[in-house]
Amino acid sequence: MSAYRKGNIFIISAASGTGKTTLVSRLLANHNGLRVSVSHTTRPPREGEANGVHYHFVSKEEFESLIAQEAFLEYADVFGNYYGTGAEGVNALAAAGYDVILEIDVQGAAQVRDALPEAVGIFILPPSFDVLAARLNGRGTDSREVIQRRLSKARHEIEQSVLFDFVVVNDDLARAEEDLRHIVNACRLKRSRQLGFIADLLENS
């Protein structure tokens, strides 16, 4: 966290099964000054997921009440479940100088970029569709029909990667994490993100 600058907002998107969640977890564990935005969802928790840590798990009625209050930067219905990013928490973290990660889908990323043009978009690519299919099958949580739908959707999502600022291929977890760290560090060093430090330096010269 820096006392001199507003934090960056990083949008990290990927097709389902690309390893985005694992990469983000590793990045948060090994990189200081980063916070993740905890999304709201109406889907049931998976094994090992905790409310308020991985997601805010809410009912459909609660989610739709938040929509009516315009509480989300973005939200979407994904395979019958709502997902959304709360605006208040993201803005508070960035204002405090933290870099904020939004781990959201392509549709949500477009909504956030419209609302926050300064946000940095990063898209995670699988090394191949064969690897992606194997990862989805390996989860053991979805039917064959759902997996085929996810693969079909993945092709469309990967086509949308041209709208992002950076792409990272997750063929090796450690290397992909290192690529993400380089992106975060480079964005922190942008002149536009160091104006507070520069002004303070000149004032005290």
From Swiss-Prot:
Q: Locate the Guanylate kinase-like domain: which residues?
A: 7-185
Q: Which catalysed reactions does the entry list for this protein?
A: GMP + ATP = GDP + ADP
Q: Does the keyword Kinase apply?
A: yes
CC terms in the record's Gene Ontology section: cytosol
Q: Report residues binding ATP.
A: 14-21
Task: Identify the EC number(s).
Answer: 2.7.4.8
This protein's major location comes to cytoplasm
Gene Ontology terms, MF aspect: ATP binding; guanylate kinase activity
State its location(s).
Cytoplasm
Provide the leader sequence positions.
none
Q: Does the keyword Hydrolase apply?
A: no
Top-tier EC class: transferase
Q: Which InterPro entries match?
A: GK/Ca_channel_bsu, Guanylate_kin-like_dom, Guanylate_kinase, Guanylate_kinase_CS, P-loop_NTPase
Q: Which UniProt keywords apply?
A: ATP-binding, Cytoplasm, Kinase, Nucleotide-binding, Transferase
Entry function = Essential for recycling GMP and indirectly, cGMP.
Family stated for the protein in its record: Belongs to the guanylate kinase family.
Q: What is this protein called?
A: Guanylate kinase
| Source species | Neisseria meningitidis serogroup B (strain ATCC BAA-335 / MC58)
